[in-house]
Design a protein with these regions (language model features):
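Alpha-helical transmembrane segments and their immediate juxtamembrane cytosolic regions
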Residues: 2-432
Length: 432
């Protein structure tokens, strides 16, 4: 009897140690809630994150490791794989915030929920800000005062924006659902136009220069306009996800799958219809739309018998059609994963591996940048493929060892969990 009690205590202790590793997706995937209806896990969310992170690693390493003769594959591949990129993670981040708020608001004070989200978002933004320090500023931000600390910390890279998304989603959720949809669509439609107007006026008045600095930033991977629109749209889907999960039935999951699937198809179709025209670097400004450079890279080859005449606008990140297109694919990918992972219960070795990768995706994302420096433009494609799978497997193994045997101490997921615990502890101290 005493051995059984000891084993149970040990299991509880281990579960407590590793629970912080799920902090970024805790709202959707946590089992530790007193409401029996919420005990069902959506493993598909972690599956999507895991699939996305290994494809992001593929894109990043192909850019860094493929030799000059084969680098055109990066330009072609990344244009198609961008559907697994920032937009998917931003949507998942917003969904997790919504679910976390809705699930905990009846048992945890509003102040604690708010502080957890704020601290977590700020922590991710700080990590992203340090990445900005390693990126040199180009004109017009290579001069004083933009080229000195702390302004060099500012830039909308994926981590910086993801942290901001956590915070923004909390406040956006307070708006009426219909208002959110309207605002989100309006931002998608006028955001890129407004950003272009501000950019082309930066030489006329310092106000436009500073507006462009904050809206587009010296690191315009995900400029505030129009990307903030995803927060308004995704919180709407987050509330529906919570509603269906709260019912806790297979029929509810099927309805969730259908809504996400149909919505995804509609968004994708809208993006393609709006953005079917082709662009080149002569028809669209590379300073505003950096990913048009993928076309230049794709055409820099001697193997194919033709040159791509242009890049469809819906492939060019941050255009109106691109936001619709990427948002649609994010919803479609999530819906398909819900169907196969949660409804059909497909849990093979590969799926379980991706689910684990999803739980440690932030750590893998950060480590990815270090592996990129191991080699520089030296691999033909066949050797790159072997090396890529080796690196992905090794990173997964190392993260598994780190998580199981070292409790994930020091990982970003562990840090996020500790930050949330601090916020909760602070509230308890104030109560006493």
């Amino acid at each position: 009897m005493s051995n059984t009690i000891t084993d149970k205590n040990q299991i509880k202790s281990e579960e407590k140690d590793v629970s912080s590793l799920r902090s970024l997706s805790e709202g959707i995937t946590s089992d530790n809630d007193n409401n029996p209806k919420l005990k069902r896990r959506l493993n598909s969310i972690d599956f999507v994150k895991g699939l996305a992170i290994i494809l992001i690693i593929l894109s990043h390493l192909s850019d860094a490791w493929l030799n000059s003769e084969w680098r055109f594959l990066f330009g072609i591949g990344t244009a198609f794989l961008d559907i697994f990129g920032p937009s998917l993670f931003i949507l998942l981040s917003a969904l997790s915030v919504v679910f976390s708020i809705k699930k905990k608001k009846e048992t945890i004070p509003e102040k604690v929920i708010r502080n957890k989200i704020l601290f977590r978002g700020i922590a991710i933004m700080i990590i992203g800000a340090f990445f900005n320090l390693s990126i040199p500023h180009n004109p017009p931000y290579d001069v004083f005062p933009f080229n000195i600390f702390p302004l060099t910390l500012w830039g909308w890279n994926i981590l910086f924006f993801m942290g901001f998304t956590q915070i923004a989603s909390y406040f956006i959720l307070k708006l009426n659902i219909n208002v959110r949809i309207v605002i989100g669509v309006i931002i998608i439609l006028i955001g890129p136009i407004l950003r272009e107007i501000i950019f082309y006026e930066i030489d006329t008045h310092p106000v436009f220069l500073w507006l462009n600095f904050f809206i587009t930033s010296p690191v315009p991977q995900l400029p505030f306009l129009p990307w903030i629109s995803i927060c308004f749209i995704s919180t709407t889907f987050g509330e529906y996800l919570f509603k269906m999960m709260n019912q806790g039935t297979e029929d509810a999951l099927i309805r969730l799958y259908k809504v996400f699937f149909i919505s995804g198809i509609l968004f994708i179709t809208s993006g393609i219809i709006i953005g079917f025209r082709l662009h080149t670097t002569s028809t669209i400004d590379i300073n505003l739309y950096e990913t048009i450079d993928w076309l230049t890279i794709a055409n820099n080859q001697n193997f194919l018998q033709f040159q791509f005449p242009g890049m469809p606008e819906f492939f060019i990140r941050s255009t109106i059609s691109n936001i619709f297109y990427l948002l649609g694919w994010a919803l479609l990918i999530i819906s398909i994963s819900i169907y196969y992972i949660d409804i059909k219960g497909k849990k093979g070795i590969f799926n379980r591996m991706l689910i684990f990768y999803g739980k440690v995706s932030l750590s893998l994302f950060l480590i990815m940048f270090l592996t990129g420096y191991l080699f520089t433009e030296g691999f033909p494609p066949w050797f790159f493929v072997i090396t890529y799978f080796g690196v992905v497997g090794l990173l997964g193994f190392l993260m598994y060892v780190w998580t199981i045997y070292f409790k994930g101490i020091g990982t970003p997921e562990w840090i996020m969990g500790k930050i949330g615990a601090i916020a909760h502890k602070k509230n308890n101290v104030e109560k006493n």
